């Protein structure tokens, strides 16, 4: 497979004025027609905790620590993407079936705070709410690490993630579709849940650009992932989530994007071979959580600014420009604690 590299490197420390001007003018992207996105997936209420060691830290010893809650807000891939695009000025319509716990209500409130339209978000006793605790600590050798623990709000029953039903006379997905009075410019989702895949397939049949993100691929469920990818226009995943790329040969009518961490990003448009773009270097990394979500949201936003919200609009030049802009945002966000640090620092 042909692989090309394009060298357009930036260093965040040298381009702060550029990225800050992008941030300050974020809502000037679309004066004539406000773009819209509908998105769904597995949402979390993230609690970001930092461990402090009041008596100092000695490698190899059991050190006393205290935990300080730094941030508590909606997170996860779909939560971040939809909130970031709401902040960018899009009409952002998340779909979510939360419970009516305090945590579930906060997630809805957070969506509104970031500019989302919560018309398709519900808080009911039958809903589900996921909680994720992210602890910033030091390992036994004194190196910074992140520890993750997922839990669920009181009253959230199994299964934790709630979705529309697709079968039976009382199926809720057909009712949702029947009640829609508009088509978004983009439909985004990140799970293999049948309802969200079927909604994406239907959206695509109506001319909506469908963006599918693979967070983690379990090979025993590979056929489900492949089905989602085949029914989408844009497919994105990281090199950590997906290592074997042999299936990409079956996606020759797609845009496939793979993020490479510190090595940058690469894309394959319509089976023409991989094009590798360099990273945007940041010499002041605080927290890399959420960088992939910033890449996704900023890439979608960059496409919108260029009027490229139809798959036919995608060219190598447009994708290159948009992915480099997306990496600018993702790299900048790494200088802040939390998945939406840029927003917090600029509001």
Annotate the PLM regions.
Residues 18, 23-95, 102-106, 113-116:
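Glycine-rich phosphate/adenosyl-contacting loop at the front of the ribokinase-like
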Residues 65-73, 279-290:
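Short pre-catalytic strand/loop immediately N-terminal to key active-site residues, enriched for Gly-Thr
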Residues 82-84, 286-314:
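Short, small-residue alpha-helix embedded
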Residues 26, 30-48, 110-123, 136-278, ...:
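Ribokinase/PfkB-type carbohydrate-kinase core domain
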Residues 114, 302, 329, 333:
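Short alpha-helical functional segments enriched in proximate histidine and acidic residues
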Residues 1-4, 8-11:
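Positively charged N-terminal leader segments that act as targeting/secretion signals
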């Amino acid at each position: 497979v042909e692989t090309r590299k394009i060298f357009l490197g930036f260093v965040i420390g040298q381009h702060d004025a550029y990225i800050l001007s992008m941030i300050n003018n974020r809502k000037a992207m679309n004066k004539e027609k406000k773009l819209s996105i509908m998105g769904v997936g597995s949402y979390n209420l993230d609690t970001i905790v930092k461990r402090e060691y009041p008596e100092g830290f000695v490698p190899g010893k059991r050190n006393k620590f205290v935990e300080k809650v730094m941030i508590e807000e909606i997170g996860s891939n779909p939560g971040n993407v939809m909130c970031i695009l709401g902040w960018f000025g899009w009409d952002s319509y998340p779909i979510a079936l939360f419970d009516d716990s305090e945590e579930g209500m906060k997630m809805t409130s957070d969506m509104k705070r970031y500019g989302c339209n919560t018309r398709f978000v519900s808080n009911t006793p039958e809903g589900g709410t996921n909680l994720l605790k992210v602890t910033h600590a030091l390992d036994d050798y004194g190196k910074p690490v992140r520890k993750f623990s997922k839990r669920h709000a009181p009253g959230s029953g199994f299964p934790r993630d709630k979705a529309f039903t697709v079968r039976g006379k009382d199926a809720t997905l057909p009712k949702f579709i029947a009640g829609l009075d508009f088509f978004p410019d983009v439909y985004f989702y990140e799970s293999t849940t049948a309802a969200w895949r079927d909604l994406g397939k239907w959206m695509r049949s109506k001319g909506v650009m469908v963006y599918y993100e693979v967070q983690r691929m379990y090979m025993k469920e590979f056929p489900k992932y492949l089905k989602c990818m085949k029914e989408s226009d844009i497919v994105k995943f990281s090199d950590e989530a997906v290592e074997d790329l042999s299936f990409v040969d079956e996606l020759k009518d797609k845009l496939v994007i793979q993020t490479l961490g510190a090595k940058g990003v690469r894309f394959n448009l319509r089976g023409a071979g991989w094009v590798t773009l360099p990273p945007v270097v940041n010499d002041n990394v605080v927290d890399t959580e959420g960088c992939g979500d910033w890449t996704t949201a900023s890439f979608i936003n960059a496409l919108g600014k260029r009027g490229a919200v139809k798959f036919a609009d995608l060219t190598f030049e447009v994708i290159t420009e948009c992915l480099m802009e997306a990496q600018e945002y993702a790299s900048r966000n790494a200088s802040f604690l939390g998945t939406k640090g840029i927003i917090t620092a600029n509001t």
